[in-house]
Design a protein with these regions (language model features):
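Cyclophilin-like peptidyl-prolyl cis-trans isomerases
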Residues: 2-10, 17, 22, 27-205
Length: 205
């Protein structure tokens, strides 16, 4: 990631923040985003958060392994009680890995990267966070709050970040989350000063 030519240094710093926090700290215009999957077939997941509900439509035709992985974590209630632990306005909000007291949750084995699927890291899309190893995504995800072309395959490190769905309701909630005050907590940066909790993640269809 570090050798990718980017126009703005702040964005380069933000790219580093998409590393999945782990043992060593590991990462749209909604209505206009065209997809090949019909709305009737796409699974939907509701994230009930402490700031309101966010509904995600997922695309198993484009990112089959990523979607099944995410849905299994939902079925296992992995996300219930986790927080958005990294929030950067004009970039993304990231969650799915920690409880409010920053206890890291156990995960299943990592999945292969599916970033070259034609889906873009546009505003309102959801993608998997990972380490510098492209095939290291487990449970952590992020929602893009702006169009982040620098994250699309093969950028920023020759691989890109795998988009697997988009927000179809609750983008106003995402926009509230992106504006919360943040600070440092231990080795973690851009941590909301008040925990933003995913109370429950449920499969709607």
């Amino acid at each position: 990631m570090q050798n990718t030519p980017l126009k703005q240094r702040p964005l380069r710093r933000h790219l580093a923040s998409l590393l999945v926090a782990g043992a060593a700290v590991a990462l749209f215009p909604v209505a206009a985003w065209a997809q090949s999957t019909s709305a009737g077939e796409a699974p939907k997941v509701r994230l009930s958060t402490s700031m309101g509900d966010i509904v995600l439509e997922l695309y198993p035709d484009k990112s089959p392994k990523t979607v099944e992985n995410f849905l299994q974590y939902v079925r296992d209630k992995h996300y219930d009680g986790t927080v958005f632990h990294r929030v950067i306005n004009n970039f993304m909000i990231q969650g799915g890995g920690f409880t409010a007291d920053f206890q890291q949750k156990a995960t299943r084995p990592s999945i292969p990267l599916e970033a070259s699927n034609g889906l873009k890291n546009d505003r309102g899309t959801i993608a998997m966070a990972r380490t510098q190893n492209p095939n290291s995504a487990t449970a952590q995800f992020f929602i893009n709050v702006v169009d982040n072309a620098a994250l699309n395959a093969p950028n920023p490190d020759g691989y890109g970040y795998a988009v697997f769905g988009k927000v179809t309701a609750g983008m106003d909630v995402v926009d509230k989350i992106k504006l919360v005050p943040v600070g440092n907590q231990g080795m973690h940066q851009n941590v909301p000063k008040t925990p933003l909790t995913i109370l429950k993640a449920t499969l709607e269809k």
